[in-house]
């Protein structure tokens, strides 16, 4: 796992703590429906699971329910207006990316978040990624390997030369299927699963620890 040439990152729960603004949108819908707000601690594990996971948490519904589509659009409208109010990079991410840039290591972002949210958020956070792949950039989303392979191709690095850092089982599944070194961001959201059972080659408790996998 030594000597990898490029780094790819998930966004929500890996580079950025987006749960506060996602939670704001969810709680706005709950208050409108006469429900109590949920705590950030209860929202955080679902923050990597997109609208489906958040609406499932907040309202107990899924895409098969009649009310889902309308709530989804309302959620996205609220979130779009509050995209980076309280979202921040995790401690250590700025330092990691600065060191990666200093070493001349190419890096990018591969997220399932739609590009209409991803690009403004990346810009607001001041992230200068060499490639950004969103949930609608390719035919498939993670856990399919296509988005990661697309990003590696854009960087001009073979998949075997890339490390991918993510905080969800789908990140591990996608990166392993792509032939990349898969590392879990143990400081991230992690969902409801046991990260130790995902099959990744390693895990880190602080972003700067990723440097040991890179040239």
List the predicted regions and their residue ranges.
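Generic enzyme active-site microenvironment
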Residues: 8-10, 110, 165-166
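Short beta-strand-loop/turn "lid" adjacent to the catalytic site in phosphate-handling enzymes
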Residues: 106
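Asp-based, Mg2+/Mn2+-dependent phosphohydrolase catalytic module
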Residues: 1-5, 41, 98-101, 115-215
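N-terminal helical cap/lid subdomain that shapes the substrate entry/recognition surface
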Residues: 2-95, 103, 114-116
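Hydrophobic residues in well-ordered beta-strands that form the structural core
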Residues: 17, 109-111, 184
